[in-house]
Amino acid sequence: IRDQPRSRGLGDVYKRQTIDGPSGVGKGTLAFSLAEKLGWNVLDSGLLYRLIGFLSLKEKLETPHEIIICINNSKIKLLTNLKKRICEIELDDKVLGKELRNEDVASKASEFAKNSEIRNAIMKIQRNAYEKEKGLIADGRDMGTVIFPEAVLKVFLQASSEVRAERRANQLKEKGMSVIMHDLLRQIQQRDKEDINRKISPLKPADGSLLIDTSNLSIKEVEKRVMENYKKL
């Protein structure tokens, strides 16, 4: 673990923390633990890309241009449900739930997430999320490097691919699904390679990030470390 150096005081600035890292390191769990402690909102950046996937299928949109027009003509509101520990999206006054959480939507989301025009459109929504409300914990892969470079605290979580594969396997088993560890590990390693080497917003720690390896840490231990650094600000 490497501590982030002492920064300027918060003053009246809008409070933002970012949590970046690959899949399976505990970003979402940490985000909600911190949000509950601080009374802040949570931004799940991946959910917005799932919205893109959902819209492309629902409206039969095929090009980034069509999707961006659809986004601009839609009423999109981001919601934090601390009780359920989930982020939700309200689209044209309807809260979307399971509609965003299926493999077809995820596949489309991954496809369009590689497009720079789509990412710029999503960034505008992310930047304005909860803008005039309480503080924000932003969970993603480029939150500290691209979306909120001014964040008062930037956290980058990491863990070995073997540990992350084991965590994912346990999640799937809890849902009654069969698991092939070799395949899970290969998928995680392939995703890491793609995230790190992509041309647009590659996965990497932001300058001055608090780096934490969660391989052998509990969520409480990670939360304690982050809060210690936050209190130094």
Positions of the model-derived regions?
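Single conserved hydrophobic/aromatic residue that forms the stacking wall/gate
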Residues: I1-Y14
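Hydrophobic anchor at the beta1->P-loop junction of P-loop NTPases
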Residues: I19
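P-loop (Walker A) phosphate-binding loop of NTP-binding proteins
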Residues: P22
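ATP-binding Walker
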Residues: V25
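Walker A/P-loop
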Residues: G28
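N-terminal phosphate/diphosphate-binding loop that engages ATP/GTP or pyrophosphate donors
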Residues: E36-E103
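NTP-dependent small-molecule kinase module
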Residues: E90-L100, A106, A169-E174, K193-L233
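ATP-dependent NMP and nucleoside kinases share a basic, alpha-helical "lid"
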Residues: G97-A113, E117-K175
